[in-house]
Structure formats: C-alpha cells, structure tokens
Amino acid sequence: MVKSFFVTGTDTDVGKTLVARTLLLEFAAHGLRCAGYKPISAGCARTPDGLRNLDAVLLQEAASLPLPYDLVNPYAYEPPIAPHIAASEARDAITLKGLSDGLRQIEQAGAELVVVEGAGGWFLPLDRKHLLSDWVKQENMPVIMVVGAKLGCLNHALLTFAAIRNNNLPVAGWVINRLHGSMSHYQENLDTLRGLLPAPFLGEIPFVNNPLEADLRGRLDISPLL
C-alpha cells in the first residue's frame, strides 16, 4: 500500500517546499521509491517546456522516483494569485477528482511513498464551494504541519492544528522553520508549542540564506513517519 503525507503550513511562505524537499531526500536515503506531488501552483514561469513552478521542480528533483513534470504539478498557473482565481481566469477548474486522479497516477507509476505539498495554508479555496482540505480529508491523508517561526506563530500553529483535527485527520508530525536569523524568544516559543501540540515533533529547520539550495538532510527525524 502506498503511503502519502500532506504537507501544510501555518501561512503562505513558511517553508512547505523546504520541508517537503528535505523529507523526500530523507526518504530516498532510506531506500524508498518516493515521489513529490505539488498538485496546485500559481506564479509559474513560462519556459520552452511550458509553465514551470520552482517549488514543483524542486520536489521533482528531490524524489527518488523520476516523474514527468506534468504528473508532479497538474494544475499550474502563471499569475501569482490565489489558484482558484487563476484557474477561473484561465477558464479551468480545480476538481477533487482531478487531484485524486493525479495522485493515483503517481501511485501507479511505482511510488512507495508520496509527499504532497499544499498551496497557501490549510483552508485554500479550490472554488466557491470546496477547499483543498476537503480533498485531503477525502483521501484521509496524514498531515505534516510546518510552523513558520515569527511573531504570531503560536496562534497560527494552534489554529491550524485545531482545524486539521476538526477535519478528523491525524497530524503525523510538525516542523518549525526559522524564517529569520533572529527571533525574540524563539526557544520559548518552540518550548510552548512542544508542550501544547500533541503530535510528534520532527525537528527544526535553521535559518539559511538560500533555503531552497541548502542540503538539510539530518535535520528532521522521519522515524515517526516510517
């Protein structure tokens, strides 16, 4: 049976891709045929090969199972706006079935484990009726929560955690990502979250100047996920 994890964040730009990429590298190092799935992206660049999203490319490259880009990122839009608005402007629709069909194709391609990266935060609209979290619930995927370390992260983390649990989904673990070189009372914030979040703490991502180029293997404890 193929195992999948959904990576969400407490906000936009808190390090979901960094964590998803690091997880893929760790799983690959353990000999697993792992794949990345970034089903929805906006802010894509035009290339000779079509629209490309840097986050999706990084997941594609980190995975041990080679897959074509269109399988990794089926819903790709150029404007850097909310994906459902970008889809509407492109006369497209992001559907629950389309998201599931994409995941099934990756499973059928031979993946043993799939790291699925969300877009935005937990409650990302797909249209005026559905949220990306509806799909995660439909797939009954365990969730990995990325906490961006900044002022307000305690509230953001607790709200996101509560929302995930209210969807009756398990939180497989959580990661804190240092967004800045210095944060007042960082350790106290981390200690508070470790006391309040009843889920495995997978580790800390340090602040680095070029995070998407950094090799952060060894920073995360994936044993609770295996």
Swiss-Prot record:
Protein name: ATP-dependent dethiobiotin synthetase BioD
Stored NCBIfam families: bioD (TIGR00347)
Family the entry assigns: Belongs to the dethiobiotin synthetase family.
Organism: Aeromonas hydrophila subsp. hydrophila (strain ATCC 7966 / DSM 30187 / BCRC 13018 / CCUG 14551 / JCM 1027 / KCTC 2358 / NCIMB 9240 / NCTC 8049)
Main location: cytoplasm
Residues involved in ATP binding: 13-18, 55, 117-120, 177-178, 206-208, 213
Alphabetical UniProt keywords: ATP-binding, Biotin biosynthesis, Cytoplasm, Ligase, Magnesium, Metal-binding, Nucleotide-binding
Listed CDD domains: DTBS
A Pfam family hit: AAA_26
Localization, UniProt: Cytoplasm
Entry GO MF terms: ATP binding; dethiobiotin synthase activity; magnesium ion binding
